[in-house]
């Protein structure tokens, strides 16, 4: 059997208002658009890079 893919659960903690367009686009790419929303994404280098780009606006809730 194949291993289950690792996932990261994120929560948006900061607003995208008055942020650069690239940071807003990154939040949309992470499936986040409002404070308090959560999304579960695969743990890949691309997703980790996106999280690092907006680390001041999101927090990692859970890593599986």
Swiss-Prot record:
GO terms for biological process? Answer: translation
Gene3D superfamilies from the xrefs?
Ribosomal protein L30, ferredoxin-like fold domain
Q: Which CDD domains match?
A: Ribosomal_L30
Q: One GO molecular function term? A: structural constituent of ribosome
Question: What Pfam families does this protein map onto?
Answer: Ribosomal_L30
Q: Which UniProt keywords apply?
A: Ribonucleoprotein, Ribosomal protein
Q: Which GO terms describe its cellular component?
A: cytosolic large ribosomal subunit
The source's domain of life comes to Bacteria
Q: Which family does it belong to?
A: Belongs to the universal ribosomal protein uL30 family.
Subunit text: Part of the 50S ribosomal subunit.
Designated name of the protein:
Large ribosomal subunit protein uL30
Give the organism the record lists.
Bradyrhizobium diazoefficiens (strain JCM 10833 / BCRC 13528 / IAM 13628 / NBRC 14792 / USDA 110)
Q: What is the lineage of its organism?
A: Bacteria, Pseudomonadati, Pseudomonadota, Alphaproteobacteria, Hyphomicrobiales
């Amino acid at each position: 059997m194949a291993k289950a893919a690792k996932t990261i659960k994120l929560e948006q903690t900061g607003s995208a208002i008055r942020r650069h367009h690239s940071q807003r686009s990154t939040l949309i790419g992470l499936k986040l658009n409002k404070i308090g929303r959560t999304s579960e994404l695969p743990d890949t280098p691309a997703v980790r890079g996106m999280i690092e780009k907006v680390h001041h606006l999101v927090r990692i809730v859970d890593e599986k």
